[in-house]
Amino acid sequence: PGHTAFIDPCSEEFKAASMEEFLQLGSRITTEVPLTVCENSLFGPMGASGDVWAVPPKSATIGPRDVMHAKEVVELHNFANADGSSWQRMVSRLELYGPISMECPASIYRLKKGVCYVSEAIAKPFGSWYNGIADKDI
């Protein structure tokens, strides 16, 4: 979670000792991490069926340096279920409001100037499944 392009938080190809080093890494071929393979198996090009064997095990991707030098950027967080809920809500909020870090690569977009549009499915408040936590506390 928190990847952009195929810059995954636990990818061996994008390991760096510091944020400064991370931001200098360019494009490369990556080996997909298991969570990304599972997520991508849910999309149309892979049959939207959860068939992880239909997902290519490697990807050609831009690097953090390319993200930072891009003139314009589009990062979409609009995948919603039929009821309007979204499995992307937590990671989207980490990217928008959490620390800028290598552990959430897409958070580096916040280092750039630009506009961010967030779908209603992502923006709506979290509800709590636990009685002791009020929605206002989340």
Give the location of each predicted region.
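Conserved phosphate- and dinucleotide-binding cores of soluble alpha/beta proteins
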Residues: 1-138
